[in-house]
Amino acid sequence: INIGFIGAGAVGCSIGKYLCENSSIAKIKGYYSRTSKSVDIAATFTNSKAYASPEELVNECDVICITTPDDIILKVWEQIKNYNLQQKIICHFSGSLSSDIFSGIEETKAEKISIHPMYAFSDKFTSYRQLNTARLTMEGSSKAVKVMQELFGDELHHKIFMLKASDKVKYHAAAAFASNYVVGIFDVALGLLKDCGFTDEDAVSLLGPLTMGNVKSVIENGTLEALTGPVIRNDTGTV
């Protein structure tokens, strides 16, 4: 399967590098982006081609992965849907958008799919190393799902969950609550300790074990059993 990426950020680089190192089915053809520097970096990182135009990439690939910010996915689609897409798979990796964003794809004779790894792509050059641990969600046309299940499920052994297109926003909200919102709450807690005179380092060392212990307990025992402190003791005055 010849795969190309439109968008050369952390997600595109990580998935491309991961497939390069772990798949015998996928061949990474290369990258296109509006920023030539990021294209060159991604192509070098994955030993692939830096494309000068999206049309050239589309012509040479079976699967076109749009790994841009969410707000740009539709703009990319509006551009590439005018190319010859017959029998190609158009894919994006947004957590909140469904494959329905590829409006009119039936007329192009292409297939559509959205794939979302439940994974934090924190670094363009190292995140791929633990990507094998990620669970994936998919939704799209049956033909596209079959091809990508064979790649990520059958060959790479990822646990895959199927979603309804109508559930993507709710699904993404769940991911946000469990990831970025946790970071935000932790930052509030750090701020409160710093107001008490703690240094950044001491505040992290104090709260870190508590946070890690709670997360571990939630995963192992469920949310109700993980509750501790004044809430579980019914200390209403403290609460």
What are the roles of these predicted feature ranges?
Residues 1, 88, 134:
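Nucleotide donor/acceptor-binding cores
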Residues 1-56:
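NAD(P)+-binding Rossmann beta1-loop-alpha1 motif at the extreme N-terminus of oxidoreductases
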Residues 38-45, 107-109, 126-219:
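Internal alpha-helical scaffold of NAD(P)-dependent oxidoreductase catalytic cores
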Residues 39, 73-74, 98-102, 145-146, ...:
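Short, well-ordered alpha-helical microsegments
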Residues 46-126:
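Rossmann-like NAD(P)(H) cofactor-binding subdomain of soluble oxidoreductases
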